[in-house]
């Protein structure tokens, strides 16, 4: 319907009604009728405006079809990433559809059902139905969507970059104004083979994704079977690959592209999609792992001191994922390559979590690292503590002898 002409026609009807009732000015119901007509006249523009603006923005979430046996036989999509992104979109009133190269039911890698965002997703029957009945990408009409969000997981490396229908969807969104093309973790692999006018669409685009270091640390099971290295391939296609330290939050917005580096970048990348679509973002409570990663990031960037971090944990440790923070300290030490600054930061993280989380192997590593950074006093203290608890006693005693 032509909204402007509808308004004009209704206005003419209203004028005729007003003229008719002007003649009946002495009628006792005139004043009531006049008020009613005036209210209707004022309401018409509001009704017409609301008809134009009630349609929801729509986002197509895409997951890999490659997974089998919860990732045991073949890697699939990351359930954590799907959960976080879906919940952000739903909370911000976006209409969500889910597609995969083959369509139908899709298999995620193994995941932790106790995480709050996964619990919420598993309680959402609509979301579960979408995952059981994904749309085949060949059946998707790109014109129906304002945004696409490619979920990561190692399975994305095996099928998404080679799906011509998915490439067509991305190209149509690429060539349409006011659209968003987003992905997280291994999801940006989909961009590796998408061209427009013989040029890769990510040429001169700043983006991020799962880095070479993250693959080395966390992707050993499948990385040798990958068709390409994600970081290297995107760089070779002309993209400006951006990254932060391993498994910290990093989101890059470049034109209509929104990308997240790893699973801990998921919620923020989904929120960037919402904002890039021009919508007002709904406030939400951070998840414990998300809050923990942000605290780690602040410690490493030295925007938060260790003393301040201790105070934060003392105030309410339940708001943080302590094992995650401790394990991050372990990996920080592991990849430090004897760089003193990185070794110190790693020990600080392990120290920070020690009152709440104890692991003898981690404590032994901490003691050995103290030796490397010339803090023999603390190394001795940790080694003696292990001996007193009869944990890794031989290794701890050897360390004490080496210190002397």
Regions picked out by a protein language model, each given a short descriptive name:
Residues 181-188, 270:
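Short, thiol/selenol-centered motifs that function as redox-active sites or metal-ligating centers
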Residues 52-175, 190-208, 213-225, 229, ...:
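Extended, subdomain-level signal for the structured scaffold at the beginning of enzyme domains
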Residues 7, 12-14:
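Targeting/processing segments of secretory and organellar proteins
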Residues 184, 259-260:
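Active-site-adjacent beta-strand anchor residues
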Residues 1, 9, 19-54:
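Bacterial Sec-dependent N-terminal signal peptides
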């Amino acid at each position: 319907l032509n909204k402007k002409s509808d308004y004009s026609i209704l206005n003419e009807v209203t004028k005729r009604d007003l003229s008719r009732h002007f003649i009946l000015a002495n009628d006792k119901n005139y004043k009531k009728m006049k008020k009613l007509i005036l209210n209707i006249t004022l309401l018409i523009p509001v009704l017409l405006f609301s008809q134009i603006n009630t349609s929801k923005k729509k986002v197509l979430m895409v997951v890999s079809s490659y997974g089998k046996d919860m990732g045991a036989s073949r890697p699939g999509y990351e359930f954590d990433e799907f959960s976080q992104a879906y919940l952000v979109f739903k909370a911000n009133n976006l209409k969500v559809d889910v597609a995969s190269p083959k369509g139908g039911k899709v298999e995620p890698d193994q995941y932790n059902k106790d995480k709050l965002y996964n619990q919420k997703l598993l309680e959402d029957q609509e979301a579960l139905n979408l995952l059981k009945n994904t749309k085949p990408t060949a059946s998707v009409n790109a014109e129906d969507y304002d945004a696409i969000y490619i979920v990561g997981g190692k399975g994305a490396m095996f099928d998404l970059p080679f799906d011509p229908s998915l490439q067509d969807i991305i190209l149509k969104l690429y060539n349409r104004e006011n659209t968003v093309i987003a992905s997280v973790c291994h999801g940006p692999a989909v961009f590796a083979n998408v061209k427009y006018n013989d040029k890769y669409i990510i040429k001169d685009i700043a983006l991020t994704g799962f880095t070479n270091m993250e693959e080395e640390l966390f992707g050993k099971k499948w990385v040798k079977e990958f068709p390409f290295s994600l970081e290297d391939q995107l760089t070779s296609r002309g993209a400006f690959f951006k990254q932060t330290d391993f498994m910290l939050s990093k989101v890059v917005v470049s034109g209509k592209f929104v990308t997240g580096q790893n699973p801990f970048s998921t919620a923020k990348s989904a929120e960037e999609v919402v904002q890039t679509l021009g919508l007002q973002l709904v406030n939400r409570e951070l998840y414990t792992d998300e809050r923990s990663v942000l605290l780690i990031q602040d410690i490493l960037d030295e925007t938060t001191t260790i003393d301040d971090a201790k105070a934060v944990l003392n105030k309410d440790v339940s708001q943080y994922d302590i094992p995650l923070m401790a394990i991050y300290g372990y990996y920080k030490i592991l990849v430090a390559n004897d760089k003193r600054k990185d070794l110190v930061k790693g020990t600080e993280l392990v120290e920070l979590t020690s009152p709440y989380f104890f692991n003898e192997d981690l404590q032994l590593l901490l003691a050995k690292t103290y030796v490397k950074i010339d803090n023999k006093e603390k190394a001795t203290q940790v080694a003696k503590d292990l001996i007193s608890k009869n944990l890794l006693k031989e290794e701890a005693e050897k360390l004490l002898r080496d210190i002397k």
